[in-house]
Amino acid sequence: MKILIIEDEPSLREIMQRALVQERYVVETASTYSEADAKIAAYSYDCILLDIMLPDGNGLQLLKHLKELRKRENIIIISARDSLDDKILGLDMGADDYLPKPFHTAELL
């Protein structure tokens, strides 16, 4: 299974990547909206872990773009903004799940 982690916080990105690689997943990472957009255009993933707040864009806008491209990746939103409105909006836009930060890596697996 190939997973793309889109997360701007380096320490969290590394923790998630290590945990998933240890479980034998193939993992790629992106730290910005533009880097994520380029990887999504070039490759297919089984799952995308998507942060809402990115330095150069909004994760929900990226989710909308994915759906416009008719990408079929499973999408899990990860966000420090534990807002019910964000959760409902993300799920309504097509995300498969919403994981509020902070979380234990066991919740991710």
Task: List where the protein language model places each region.
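N-terminal/domain-start alpha-helical segments
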Residues: 1-109
